[in-house]
Amino acid sequence: MQNQRIRIRLKAFDHRLIDQSTAEIVETAKRTGAQVRGPIPLPTRKERFTVLISPHVNKDARDQYEIRTHKRLVDIVEPTEKTVDALMRLDLAAGVDVQISLG
């Protein structure tokens, strides 16, 4: 698997979960002899919602909610066969979305 790269993008609502998952991925890749670049923090997406709390009148009474989507990027340069096998067997937290691309 010479001259290859594995790019892993992680998304989560909880920054503690995503940091824990990236630490597991980096530690697994380094243990199997691959070179790791990252984790690189990508911009956090903030979605804001405004909801009227009054059922009929009083437009001034509103609640505001926010959902933050945290993102990280990890590049694994020149992965070995052991690296790919270890990453496939890795069990990450349920609240983390993982996208893997080969390049």
Curated annotation (Swiss-Prot):
Cellular component, GO annotation: ribonucleoprotein complex; ribosome
GO biological process: translation
InterPro entries tied to this protein: Ribosomal_uS10, Ribosomal_uS10_CS, Ribosomal_uS10_dom, Ribosomal_uS10_dom_sf
Gene Ontology MF term list: structural constituent of ribosome; tRNA binding
The organism's place on the tree of life at top rank: Bacteria
Keyword Endoplasmic reticulum appears in the UniProt entry: no
Keyword Ribonucleoprotein: yes
Function: Involved in the binding of tRNA to the ribosomes.
Protein family (similarity comment): Belongs to the universal ribosomal protein uS10 family.
Subunit structure: Part of the 30S ribosomal subunit.
Protein name per UniProt: Small ribosomal subunit protein uS10
Source organism of this protein record: Actinobacillus pleuropneumoniae serotype 5b (strain L20)
Gene field: rpsJ
